[in-house]
Amino acid sequence: MSLSFASAPKTEQQPEYSQIVLDTFFPVINLNHMRQAMRIDNTITSVRLYEMALEAVIHVNRQLALTKQRALMAGQQTLVQTDSKLPEIRYRHAVYNYTKANLSEIYADYDATGKTASRFESKQQSADDYRREAHAAIADILGVHRVDAELI
């Protein structure tokens, strides 16, 4: 008797969808690394991940536009030059988490087992959690508090 196990398909991006470079000031986003770090399986196609990550990069870059402008005026050509390695790490964290939030929302009603109603709420909560993580990463880059609260 022999046992045979089906191997899972590879979760690598197609080469033309493996990186996002919109602006040389900000770090390159490696989508193969994102897949591994955020546990994005092969049910998300290369094109879909690329599109969702592109939206996240645009969103994060807009939030950091003033930071970029100030850095360029100070003679710094990249986000990494503004400080230690921390801004690059936080930038990646923001992009990865916004991407995962977008994917969680889009695929909230997708479930191969047919239990979509019970999983919808938990996936929506996950999307909110990913967004909160991304917001915290951007707040760290900007040097502002992560939470704004006012006593009424």
Predicted regions and their residues:
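Conserved short "hinge" loops at termini or chain/domain junctions
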Residues: 1-80, 143-152
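Short loop/turn elements at secondary-structure junctions
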Residues: 87-152
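Generic serine detector
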Residues: 2-7, 18, 46, 84, ...
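Short, glycine/alanine-rich amphipathic alpha-helical segment
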Residues: 79-88
